[in-house]
């Protein structure tokens, strides 16, 4: 209850408390939410120190300064709306990070139409403790009646002391106060008087609000840009121009700054960034030329399987750590274990995906280029030109088909597959959903129907199949849960093991169908995993494997996927332990088919060239060459990364990894420039090739 003896100056001060108190409360609450997000990232070398708090506060001030230009009522409404919007952004980033270990970018938002399709995957990432993000909303709802009552009391006392109320019957005063009940309208009441005085007072109030807002903007920019400049001129030098992980940018700019920079980067790419110089383009061409020459090895395996059909199966979330493993005495992947005996099994094969996940694996495996640091090539640059497996094989007389029992628009596949040269893309509309499972059709029926479609096509063919049944959140109907996962029962890790066991059974049926249809002896069958399972809890892997794990162990587990290549005659079977990656698949298959990639714009190595030390670079900047293994720090500093010996698994001096790191960063930059600037089209036009 405010004392009725308060004069007009006191009530003006009270209005200032409302205006600036609500603004400071907004800053405090939003900083808490940013801190809550940060505390759930658990990223090495990413700490929220004092300067990071300063950046956060400055960014919030720069984003909200304009609310101080409004009336008190308008300001409070604007702050509530801004609170809701920023909370939605922060929480969306947290959910996205739980699955992708990354933040949302603008290219990802352009794929927002796919969110509805994710369904249970998103639900599984929601935690009850996340309700803390809405705690301030609950307080506002509960406290609103009290605040409203206080506002009316303030307005009533203002009316009683205003010139307009002088001489009025006391019974009329409440009516006036009802009309002007809200505290924000006090300014209007206080301004009543001679017209000139009223206008002068309003003008002064607007000048004060404008000045305060601009002062907050200048201060906010100073608090945010100052520390960022300090970082980028010292330990984070070159960060904003390099091809770094989003976490590295976040560590310097803060969350809001990261999103501002992401918008700038997107606009630069699409509205018109700095063009590449002729010298830069020549350097890129020279790199591709040298890489092509190193791949062009004409040994006994070159062309050994010329004219063979090719079936490539990209298996959802199939990771390498389960191959050959048992749980409760039962093999998790019995059919893949059997296939391994007659196939080339690459036990140190790495997925090289980024934010595009499945679409990135598709792109890297078929185009032998790195995915983008932000978004997916499929959705951003589907109209650009690439040297891809389906088109290259079509140029030599093959027919090319893609199979995926899901919506053709997902990941913009229909448009991308047309650009890649596929003769036909069989999507969900082309399948009978007679085995509904997970996202769509179960893999067993998917393989059966896909092979039936292939039987009607001419040979030789290139067939690219994408499975779905082992997709997050790994839910199987009870009748398909045939693996006893023991103590993992009821956990998502246990569900994942069940899902992979089901997919393994589907692969076993595929092999038998190929034999029955006469395809086994004239087809190269390639099976690999597209990416990890997004389950990062180290304790589950240690429990499953029965041993403690190091940082290097976990890095390999989360980045290695199996690769099986079964050749028509079963030759060259065995386990290959050299490090290889998804970029290496296309040039290696072309080598077996006798098609040179010397003049192709590909970045991958030829797995059959006899070199045991191919450099495999991941999108994060991690790399291995079978001798050294480098794990980067999220802060982007080379010196804060860790260099390991592959032979011993022990940490070695960081300088031993410097030369390879320089090459790794160069490759990522060349690939990004090639994709973004559509350089392959430009280079081939210059060379007179179609």
Predicted regions and their residues:
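N-terminal membrane topogenic signal
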Residues: 6-26
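Canonical alpha-helical transmembrane segments
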Residues: 58-76
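Juxtamembrane "helix-exit" motif on the non-cytosolic side of transmembrane helices
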Residues: 32-45, 92-97
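Solvent-exposed soluble domains appended to multi-pass membrane proteins
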Residues: 287-690
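Alpha-helical transmembrane segments of polytopic membrane proteins
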Residues: 47-60, 127-139
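Membrane-helix interface and helix-disruption motif detector
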Residues: 39-51, 73-75
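N-terminal secretory/membrane-targeting segments
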Residues: 19, 23, 79-163, 173-176, ...
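Short, intrinsically disordered terminal tails adjacent to the first/last structured region
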Residues: 1-9, 164-192
């Amino acid at each position: 209850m405010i004392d009725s003896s308060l004069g007009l100056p006191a009530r003006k001060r009270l209005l200032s408390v409302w205006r600036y108190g609500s603004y400071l409360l907004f800053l405090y609450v939003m900083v808490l939410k940013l801190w809550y997000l940060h505390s759930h990232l658990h990223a090495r070398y990413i700490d929220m120190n004092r300067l990071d708090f300063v950046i956060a506060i400055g960014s919030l001030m720069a984003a909200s300064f304009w609310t101080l230009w409004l009336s008190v009522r308008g300001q409070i409404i604007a702050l509530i709306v801004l609170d809701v919007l920023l909370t939605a952004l922060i929480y969306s980033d947290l959910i996205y990070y739980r699955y992708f270990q990354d933040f949302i970018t603008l290219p990802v938002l352009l794929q927002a139409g796919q969110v509805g399709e994710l369904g249970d995957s998103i639900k599984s990432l929601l935690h009850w403790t996340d309700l803390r993000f809405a705690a301030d909303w609950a307080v506002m709802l509960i406290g609103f009646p009290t605040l409203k009552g206080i506002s009316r009391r303030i307005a009533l006392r203002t009316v009683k002391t205003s010139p307009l109320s002088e001489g009025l019957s006391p019974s009329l005063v409440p009516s006036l106060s009802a009309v002007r009940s809200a505290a924000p309208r006090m300014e209007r009441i206080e301004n009543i008087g001679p017209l000139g005085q009223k206008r002068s007072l309003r003008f002064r109030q607007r000048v004060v609000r404008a000045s305060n807002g601009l002062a907050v903007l200048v201060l906010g920019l100073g608090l945010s840009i100052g520390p960022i400049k300090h970082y980028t001129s010292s330990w984070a030098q070159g960060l904003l121009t390099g091809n770094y992980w989003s976490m590295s940018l976040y560590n310097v700019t803060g969350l809001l700054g990261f999103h501002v920079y992401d918008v700038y980067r997107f606009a630069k790419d699409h509205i018109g960034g700095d063009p590449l110089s002729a010298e830069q383009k020549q350097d890129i061409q020279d790199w591709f030329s040298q890489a092509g020459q190193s791949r062009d090895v004409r040994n006994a395996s070159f062309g050994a399987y010329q004219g063979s059909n090719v079936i490539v199966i990209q298996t959802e979330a199939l990771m390498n750590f389960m191959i050959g493993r048992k749980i409760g005495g039962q093999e998790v992947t019995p059919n893949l274990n059997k296939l391994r005996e007659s196939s080339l099994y690459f036990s140190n094969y790495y997925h090289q995906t980024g934010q595009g996940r499945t679409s990135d694996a598709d792109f890297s495996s078929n185009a032998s280029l790195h995915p983008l640091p932000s978004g997916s090539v499929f959705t951003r640059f589907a109209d650009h030109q690439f040297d891809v497996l389906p088109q290259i094989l079509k140029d030599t007389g093959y027919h090319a088909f893609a199979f995926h029992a899901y919506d053709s628009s997902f990941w913009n596949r229909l448009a991308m597959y047309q650009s890649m040269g596929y003769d036909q893309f069989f999507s969900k509309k082309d399948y009978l959903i007679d085995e509904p499972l997970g996202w769509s059709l179960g893999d067993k029926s998917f393989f059966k129907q896909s092979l039936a479609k292939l039987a009607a096509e001419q040979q030789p063919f290139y067939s690219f199949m994408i499975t779905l049944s082992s997709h997050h959140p790994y839910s199987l109907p009870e009748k398909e849960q045939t693996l006893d996962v023991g103590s993992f029962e009821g956990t998502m890790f246990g569900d994942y093991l069940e899902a992979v066991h089901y997919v393994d059974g589907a692969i076993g049926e595929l092999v038998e169908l190929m034999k029955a249809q006469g395809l086994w002896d004239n087809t190269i069958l390639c099976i690999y995993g597209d990416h990890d399972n997004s389950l990062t809890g180290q304790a589950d892997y240690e429990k499953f494997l029965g041993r403690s794990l190091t940082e290097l162990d976990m890095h390999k587990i989360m980045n290695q996927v199996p690769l099986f290549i079964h050749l028509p005659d079963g030759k060259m079977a065995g386990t290959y332990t050299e490090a290889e990656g998804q970029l290496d698949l296309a040039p290696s298959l072309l080598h077996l088919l006798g098609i040179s990639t010397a003049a192709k714009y590909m970045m991958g190595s030829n797995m059959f060239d006899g070199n045991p030390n191919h450099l495999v670079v991941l999108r994060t900047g991690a790399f291995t060459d079978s001798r050294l293994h480098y794990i980067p720090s999220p802060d982007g500093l080379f010196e804060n990364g860790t260099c390991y010996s592959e032979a011993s698994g022990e940490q070695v001096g960081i300088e031993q990894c410097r030369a390879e790191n320089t090459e790794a960063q160069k490759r990522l930059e060349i690939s990004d420039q090639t994709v973004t600037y559509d350089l392959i089209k430009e280079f081939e036009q210059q060379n007179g090739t179609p």
